[in-house]
Structures are given as structure tokens and as C-alpha cells.
């Protein structure tokens, strides 16, 4: 009986610790893109946006997030290569 209660107590403690750890890991990965970028000079045609992605997430998810970030700023997606996101300066029409 004591072994069963001890086992269940350890199981509950380990599952709660696991959920806390995964919650903190997921909150660190959240990226906020609502801050507007600094307006570029007139000579530039493209604006760099650094989203902070890693190779683990892959190019497809990076380019998807890149397009969403450009759309939020009211701009078109110009290029997405080598984990560099570039939006056009011209606004959406």
C-alpha cells in the first residue's frame, strides 16, 4: 500500500514538473512581430526582417511566418532565402 501511494505521488510530481517545463519552453519560443520596423531610407528597395527562427523549424515554416509578418506590415513578400525575410517597401493595394 505504501509503495502504491509513493509511486502515485512521484507520478503526479513528475507530470506537473514536465508540464511546467514544457510551458516555459513554449513561452520562450513565442515571437512577437507587432512592433513596426524602422522605416528604411529612400534608396532601399527591400526591408530585412529578422524573425529569429532556427534550422530545426525549417525553411517552409520560416517563409510562411515571413509572409505573415510582411502582410501584417501591409507589404508584399519580396524574397525569403537563407533565413532572411525581405518585404517590399511599397504598400499593399
Curated annotation (Swiss-Prot):
Keyword entries, A-Z: Antimicrobial, Disulfide bond, Fungicide, Plant defense, Secreted, Signal
Tell me the leader sequence span: 1-19
What's one GO-annotated cellular component?
Answer: extracellular region
Is NAD found in the keyword set?
Answer: no
Give the location in the cell: Secreted
GO BP terms: defense response to fungus; killing of cells of another organism; pollen tube guidance
Q: Which cysteines are joined by disulfide bonds?
A: 63-80, 66-85, 70-87
Q: Does the keyword Protease apply?
A: no
- Describe the family membership recorded for this protein in Swiss-Prot or TrEMBL: Belongs to the DEFL family.
Q: Tell me what this protein is called.
A: Defensin-like protein 209
Which species does the entry assign this protein to?
Arabidopsis thaliana (Mouse-ear cress)
Amino acid at each position: 500500500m505504501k509503495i502504491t501511494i509513493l509511486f502515485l505521488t512521484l507520478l503526479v510530481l513528475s507530470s506537473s514538473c514536465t508540464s511546467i517545463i514544457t510551458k516555459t519552453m513554449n513561452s520562450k519560443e513565442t515571437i512577437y512581430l507587432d512592433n513596426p520596423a524602422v522605416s528604411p531610407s529612400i534608396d532601399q528597395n527591400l526591408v530585412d526582417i529578422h524573425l529569429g527562427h532556427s534550422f530545426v523549424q525549417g525553411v517552409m515554416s520560416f517563409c510562411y511566418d515571413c509572409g505573415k509578418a510582411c502582410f501584417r506590415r501591409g507589404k508584399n513578400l519580396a524574397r525569403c532565402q537563407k533565413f532572411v525575410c525581405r518585404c517590399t517597401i511599397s504598400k499593399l493595394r
